[in-house]
């Protein structure tokens, strides 16, 4: 959702934004844009429209996109029986390109089968796209290598930091106040299995048992996700609920550090957001994070909570308060990595170029 909010907000601020651009945004994205103060009147056709997976087939979306030269689904797959327009689809389904991951290996035989079928079916839908748009080069390489799409039909447009982080006057307060009493570690994201959030209570206990260090963990789960966690998790972790984009900087500001133990991503903005807020980042030692954060994160094996606890304790006891130069350098690294405005321009340019090429052909 963060990407959709950022892209639409940036498009609304472009003087060159096309008059014939139709925006279909979900309720959640629309609410986020309103809180940001985005001028949605800049679009000649802006509609609130919700689609959910396969139900898209009978949602009426087909009639809404009919007559447009290009349809760009920010993150697919796009479930339509037929797409008469040029079909550009954003790809961020890591399970398709990295199927044999740690979470998959923990599944029962039946769940492995259903998982394979689900993502095989999604891959077939992605194959129908005229062009796929990905956020990093490793995703393009994997898609081409697995035959989901020819490399010539895959465009890389780097994801990055939402511009709201650069304008404190746009930040909003949290609905739930955070009362800090000890070193606080935050996580921003959904509670998907591959996010590996089950580590948090284990790390908290290990820090106390092995290092006599008390810490607090804070997460941003929705009500359903929180209700599905164990009593042990709820007794060990604080939940502030889902945040709007404009509230995320405030959340990071109140944390002493950020943790990101994910097993699997195409790309995630959370590591960049932590670094631009000049917070130490404890993250999975995985290529999808190293490619983005370089040497500015503190890395640990996401399968090893002891290693994570030792890393955090080392930081608190030896580095905290002495890493201002590193944190400032990390912020500059993020600012130079990519640009939210340029991402929106690149998306718009891609649509216009493909439409022009098709009309000439």
Tell where the protein language model's regions lie, with residue ranges.
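Nucleotide-activated donor-binding/catalytic signature segment of Leloir-type glycosyltransferases, i.e.
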Residues: 39-44, 227-249
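Membrane-proximal helix-turn-helix segments that form the acceptor-binding/catalytic region
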Residues: 111-132
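Donor nucleotide-sugar binding/catalytic pocket of nucleotide-sugar-dependent glycosyltransferases
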Residues: 127-145, 149-168
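Conserved donor-binding/catalytic core segment of Leloir-type glycosyltransferases
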Residues: 175-195, 201-204
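Short hydrophobic beta-strand element within catalytic cores of glycosyltransferases
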Residues: 280-283
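Conserved acidic donor-binding segment of nucleotide-sugar-dependent glycosyltransferases
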Residues: 298-306, 314-320
